[in-house]
Amino acid sequence: MELLKKYPKFFQWLFLLIVFFSLCFAIEVPETYNFIRGQAEFIKDPNQSTYTLFGAEVRYYAFDVFWRLPPLLGWLPIWINDSLFFLMNEWMPMEFWNEDIQEFRTQPLLLQITRNLTSFMTFLIELIREILLGGVETIVSFSSWDWIDANPWAELPGLPWTIVTAGAVILGYKLSGKGLALFAGLVMIYISVFGQWKPSMQTLSFILVAAPLSFLFGLTFGVMAFKSKRVEKFLYPILLVMQTMPQYAVLVPAIVLFGIGDHAAVIITMVVAVPPMILLTLLGLRGIPSEVIEAGRMSGCNNWQLMTKVLIPTARRDILIGVNQVIMVCFSMAVISAFIGAKGLGFNLLLALNQLNIGLALEAGLCISLIAILLDKMSLAWANKQIDYFGNLTYFQRNKNILFFAAAVILGIIFSYLGSFYFKDGSNYLFEVPHNKGISTADFWNKGVDWIWDTFFHTLKIFNTWLIVDVLQPMRALYLRMPAVATLVLVIGAGYIIGGIRSALVVGGLTLFIALSPWWDRALVTLYMATFGVFISTIIGFTVGIISFQNKHTANFMLGVCDIFQTFPSFVYLIPVMMLFGVTDTSVLIAVIVYATIPATRYTIEGLRSVPEALHDAATMSGVNKVQRLLKIEFPLAFPHMMLGLNQTIVFALFMVIIGAFIGTEDLGQYILKALSDKKGAGIGLTLGLCVAFIGLIFDHLIRTWVGKRKKHLGIG
């Protein structure tokens, strides 16, 4: 009894695990399921009676319920599809003027709104794209093709790559000095020389439309949430779901509402990029000391002046960090949006992966990564840069960067014009290096892949076979052997032990939604892959973080490496593993491990660094050695922060598992990918996305609740 009183939580967890495993052994697999050993899969017997419930076909006998709950939510995708069809084709018909036929026509309101929004987005994208690359679409939107034929001089010529490069160098120097300027110049020269200028500018035009609009909407909603508790309570659950919702799932309804193309990609990118901007705006405004607000009030500011002149400038750094996050999300979507027709580097990367052309995929992936790193460094430098004050400076000193750029524009135009006379093969290399004229390393990488396969084929095959047959398939079978009732008991019990009745109800409700969907088995497969990746990533991340923390320079270096790897679009991680292991679960899981190790490493280093220096001094004075200090002081105090890293590791792993569906997994991501090609796939895609989001939210809720209680117990913020 004394042990029970001393360690109540331990015995609660022990009792919960005993109940869980007892249920797993007590609930046998029904005869209506067959186990396919080669696939480590439980398959329903098709020769059984069926009945329909809420539009869903149910194949269950009474004793099946403890094994797999009836898919009572099978009606949800159908309802979503019917709702979208009603909104797009029947809801609020109104008279609208049709320019093509020059008369009024009756159109549903939402259809007209989406068409107008599509036209506006297309105009913005074409405008920026033609400034960078040239064209006539923007001019045609204000005139006609006949006018363009009569006035060919009106075509926008586009900016030479030399001018864009000069602009990037000047901006980099303005924000962070010579180092960033040199890096910006090298990135732009690399893109041009390797013949990737046109797709890079197509991607950049996509970012230059999506990022500013996402910033404006995110800032607006963030301010509204700061001013109104009701708005915050309304937005909070939406933001939570959107943070864990796989980006694939959001593409499906976008096709229904906006069709395919760059315009749809920009709109759906905004949907994904706005939530982090809202959260960081709210975080920045909440962190403003009350004294600053009172000083603004005492100075006679009204509400508008207080917000624009006091609060937003004070929260400037957090808001600009939000801009950084928006840009990174836009870049990750630049690749994923290729599935719905977005042009640029993402489309080239997707095409190369479809053809299993690793060389071309690496070239496109490297360009995406370099541009992403460059914009990441620039936006962070902007966030950390102090505001310039021009007191007694001359006109040239105040505007030297603008003047230098104007000079670069003039020189770039002159050199491009002269280049048209110098280069006789029809390609003006001072304007743009065509893709077929640029340097290509695709053959080198493809030969490298062939050499790796020829040299290490047997070793890789042995490892791949061992991992799949002896580790992954047994683990997959164990997860699929988990009865739905036993899993519900485990999750609800964990919620109750960690956070009480409220947490038990929250995580129980989220789990019940997944269990009542028709894809419970696919959710278990997703969970098995994510669990394996998270387990390995956590061990590696915690170990590397603890070792790196022992030396300040090593810790800074590892944080820099984490910054670079976190900047890479997630699709890029699939390229090297496909080189080694082909289209297998092994490839996906190794990509998951690499991607998910980043937050585990970062949060471990930052958590250990957050331990107060006074405790280090007290430990040193007490005569403890480094190992004792780590185990007795640093690790216990940093562990709550490290658990937040585990939370992010889980989210990263789930994202990569879903993206891994592109190379052939059998989890929820595979069904989301199939929904993209189904004209009635919007309901299925959104429902599957919610299932993945709820898996992430279950762990997020449990971990954050535990961390909050642990920090309160330790007396740390």
Curated annotation (Swiss-Prot):
Keywords: Cell inner membrane, Cell membrane, Membrane, Repeat, Transmembrane, Transmembrane helix, Transport. The chain crosses the membrane at residues 10-30, 69-89, 120-140, 153-173, 175-195, 206-226, 238-258, 265-285, 319-339, 355-375, 402-422, 452-472, 488-508, 527-547, 574-594, 643-663, 683-703. Pfam families: BPD_transp_1. One of its GO terms (biological process) is glycine betaine transport. The keyword Lyase does not apply. One of its GO terms (molecular function) is carnitine transmembrane transporter activity. It is found in: Cell inner membrane. The keyword Membrane applies. Its main location: membrane. Residues 200-379, 523-703 form the ABC transmembrane type-1 domain. The complex is probably composed of two ATP-binding proteins (TmoW), two transmembrane proteins (TmoV) and a solute-binding protein (TmoX). Part of the ABC transporter complex TmoXWV involved in trimethylamine N-oxide (TMAO) import. Responsible for the translocation of the substrate across the membrane. This is Trimethylamine N-oxide transport system permease protein TmoV. It comes from Pelagibacter ubique (strain HTCC1062).
